[in-house]
Amino acid sequence: MDITELLQCFACTLDHNAAVRTNAETHLKNASKVPGFLGACLDIIAADEVPENIKLSASLYFKNKITYGWSAGARQGSNELLDSHVDPDEKPVVKDMLIKTMVSVSKTSPRCIRVLKSALTVIISEDYPSKKWGNLLPNSLELLANEDITVTYVGLLCLAEIFRTYRWKNNDERQDLEELILNYFPALLNYGANVLFQDGKYMNNEQIGELVKLIIKIYKFVSYHDLPFTLQRSESFTPWACFFVSIIQQPLPQEVLAISDIEVRSKNPWVKCKKWALANLYRLFQRYASTSLTRKFQYDEFKQMYCEEFLTQFLQVVFDQIEKWGTGQLWLSDECLYYILNFVEQCVVQKTTWKLVGPHYNVILQHVIFPLLKPTAETLEAFDNDPQEYINRNMDFWDVGYSPDLAALALLTTCVTKRGKTTLQPTLEFMVSTLQSAVGDYNNIMLDNALQIESCLRIFSSIIDRLITKDSPFASEMEKFILTYVLPFFKSQYGFLQSRVCDICSKLGSMDFKDPVITSTIYEGVMNCLNNSSNSLPVELTAALALQTFISDDQFNMKLSEHVVPTMQKLLSLSNDFESDVISGVMQDFVEQFAEQLQPFGVELMNTLVQQFLKLAIDLHETSNLDPDSFTNVDSIPDESDKQMAALGILSTTISILLSFENSPEILKNLEQSFYPAAEFILKNDIEDFYRECCEFVENSTFLLRDITPISWKILELIGECNRKPDSMVSYYLSDFMLALNNILIYGRNELKKNEFYTKIIFEIYQKAVTAEDNSLDDLRVVFDLSQELVLALDDSLPQQYRERLLADVVGSILTQKNELKTNVVFSVTAFNVVISNMITEPLITLQYLKQQGCLEIFFQTWITDYIPNYKRCYDIKLSVLALLKIILKLESNDYSVLNLENLVPQLGSIVTQLASRLPTALRQLANQRKEFSSSGFEEDTKWDENFLDVGDDDENDDEGDLTEKYLELIKNRADSLDFVDGYDAKETFDDLEEDPLTGSILDTVDVYKVFKESIANLQHVDSNRYQGILRHLTPADQELFMGIMNA
């Protein structure tokens, strides 16, 4: 490998000239396939004379090659330069050189170290657990012995990555870890506490801070998922806990506190040491030393030691930190505050520790929660200049990591939920007194007072559900409180207060206001906010959500009905400005509520929504095609989840609009035309996330029209094109596509019989799906649903080669599963139905094929003995009756002999009669299901059973013991007595064969009794002997059923 030439290539990748860069990348692509390339990269990175920017370029290329090529199962990068695996013969050389290179550049090129660390992580995670890097641990320990802390840092990096490999394993899966902890953790702790930390002696040294942070994270890696037995012992836990506490308590040096940029200050290694020390102690408490219904690990001795020997003293440390922070004596990063508040919240949940926290609740509320919920200068700036960020952070739409205000809200809600008897009244009293002192003249409130009001209202918004429940002692006071302290701020000069009032109103849907003035005031306030002159997005958005809450209120609805169109236009505008599914949900409810008024504007609405969807979908598609390797780190990759949810919401709204035109076929066709560009973009660009909604639209439009329009046929063509692509995911999402295909087969069957072009599309979809790798029984069930519908739709127009393929696939599956046909009921009945469907059109060919494949006997034995007596679905009963009638009518006596089915003949009359007689019951059941579904929505006066949501105040049950502990004991006792083993019975029953009341079937229009009577009459005419034979074998009860059907 020519190092000089390679060096020149890396230099040229940084050239401003695109042609030069492209040429260099081509040379690198070729060079990367030559053994020794990665070693040459490391030589360049380690060379002192190479400029920093070229070293960094080589480091990034090396890192990407390792990321995508080290593991045999590594995903391939979208960058073709990276689509090659590392030569196994080169791996030992790379591992040896990598650590030496990192040591070499640790002083001079810290940016390269950060990049190479990613490569180190990949290699260690792959090779250390599989024992392919035997000298890694001793080499790392050797580096730790070096007096040069830059060298030590590399050694600790290696150790951290070694211990990271144990992070997600249970103790029984990592027994070798216990030995490592015994051998090395005492020395590691000593090095961290007595050499590096030394009671804060070197807290002005960031390099040492990085080393201490790595030691703390090593502890985190081994204790995060499970707690090693060695670390559960007092002699191990206590010194580590003391080390963490000493770091938490040690004041930060003035040089750190002098950093004005809070974000930069928070990234200081010593600040992060405090964060991870708090995180470790919180995790130990929450996961291993608490009582919880979801607690996986039962380490009672550790729990007792933590709570009795450590928790009380540490809680004093926590309170001391909070007190100093509250009085301005101590600065805490957001992350530290987050973990402190989480720790206190966990203490609230536990009965024993609540006794320690409870007496301090008022102080915590007034001096911690209240100030944290006051908007900061940054928050106010976001309200004006970055409204989407403000909404996500302050309106409970988005749980941002390490946000102290959200942690404060979580603490507050836990207090009032779990300890409401103690906390609700003082919380309400504090809100009232603060609001009274802060309000004064509503029309002239100073900013500082407005911030206090916002904090109070945010508290109220978070606990309102506890205050307005029927059993709340404060429920009767809430109307007056809302009228006095909430609704006046609709007219506030501060937009953030208007937004908060709307937010609160959106949570008042369960209240029955006795004073009609309240609803009128809410209507006027919400509509004014929705159409506010300042066009404040947070105000408009929360107003829309409040509107959604009251949209079904009679008084509110009556007023709103006069302004339907302009309100809908405003919602559309909001949907365009705010990328979230929140507004889509409002629009969907609005369309359903005011469908009649919106009908004249249906097509215009659809066009607007489709344009909005396309704008989002194009952005999402472009982002999905970005090369992830072009981003320097994971945080740089754009998060498009909000756009995706917004797009899904818009598609759902288009379906709601469609459904509102049930009785207007011409408008429905226009709506289909308007929707087509959305379907075309989804299917042509393989946007899998929207397949289901696209097919739902087709399902609903075809159902409402009872016809397949040219637009729907074009969509089928697009599905076919999508399916033919080599990397198509149509098979994977077949259950979604079945929504459209099912109705195309039902309402387009006449066209399908004439037009082989469309039939071929559906058959190709089937073909690709049935041969997909790793098909589960559930996947095959969907495939066989499609095949039987294809058979029934085409009837005798089904091409013979198609029938042969369909039968071959399903019979092969039946034979493969022959020992589980009675247990895998859902799959097996579906597979049998493919065969039965073929019997309806070609009974003799189908039976001959079963015999040829050695499947005839097992088929009839299972069908007649196990399935037919247990059928409950209309579809199964109809299908089998039709097939049995065809067998009776179409087969000659000789056919029965050749097939060895003579013994079946005497039974056929009884079987088909009994089965047909069960159809009315099945039809009634299906009709009831449809009736129940149509009336299952919540009525206007439907209320939640508030006791259902009430977990109770644990502080009310002190005398009887903690409810959680009692429930845990109950579960334990039941488990011990073997009342349940695995929670469910693996054997399926015919109850698992659900009949969807909303999904149509080709057999829906078939009058089975009419077919029955015509078939029997025809048999009597053409073969009176067989007719008499059938009647002769009927029991008196069967004869009565038979005559009842014939006379129906």
Curated annotation (Swiss-Prot):
Tell me which Gene Ontology terms the entry assigns under biological process.
protein import into nucleus
**Which key words are in the record?**
Cytoplasm, Nucleus, Phosphoprotein, Protein transport, Transport
Q: What is its main location?
A: nucleus
Question: Which SUPFAM superfamilies does this chain map to?
Answer: ARM repeat
In this chain the Importin N-terminal domain maps to 24-104
Q: Which residues carry this modification: Phosphoserine?
A: 977
Q: A Gene Ontology MF term for this entry?
A: nuclear import signal receptor activity
The subcellular localization recorded is:
Nucleus; Cytoplasm
* Coiled-coil portions: none
Q: At the top level of its lineage, which domain of life is listed?
A: Eukaryota
**A GO-annotated cellular component:** nucleus
* Assembly and oligomerization: GTP-bound Ran dissociates the isolated NMD5/TFIIS complex.
Q: Any idea what job this protein has?
A: Active in protein import into the nucleus. Its major import substrate is transcription elongation factor TFIIS.
Note in the entry? Present with 13500 molecules/cell in log phase SD medium.
In its UniProt entry, what is this protein called? Nonsense-mediated mRNA decay protein 5
